[in-house]
């Protein structure tokens, strides 16, 4: 149990740090802040698909705890995505909210599928 908690914790710190850095990197480049979160979530979807695919050929629970649960769990953020959607809706930016929701869902599905393909599961 302690080993699992330690692995998740060791992965979570760099995942959260990288998310912070990437979102702040995208912010000056793209006027709408929600696209930084989008980029992080799509890349996390790809990486999770890749890990799941690779884990099928070379199973490793400690690696999944460190990278999937710890790193990617703190790197991507569904709750921020939902808040950003609600902010757009409250601003009456319904088209932008719909575009973000569809792009996130479709992009996430394709990213996971691509990760699974590269990881050898698909």
What are these regions (language model features)?
Residues 1-122:
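Membrane-interface helix-loop junctions in multi-pass transporters/channels
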């Amino acid at each position: 149990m302690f080993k699992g908690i330690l692995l998740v914790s060791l992965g979570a710190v760099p995942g959260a740090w990288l998310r912070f850095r990437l979102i702040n990197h995208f912010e000056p480049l793209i006027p709408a802040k929600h696209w930084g979160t989008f980029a992080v979530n799509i890349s996390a979807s790809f990486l999770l698909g890749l890990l799941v695919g690779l884990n099928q050929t070379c199973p490793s629970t400690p690696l999944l705890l460190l990278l999937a649960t710890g790193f990617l769990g703190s790197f991507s953020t569904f709750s921020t995505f939902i808040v950003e959607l609600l902010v757009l809706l409250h601003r009456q930016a319904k088209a932008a909210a719909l575009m973000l929701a569809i792009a996130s869902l479709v992009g996430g599905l394709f990213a996971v599928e691509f990760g699974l393909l590269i990881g050898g599961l698909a």
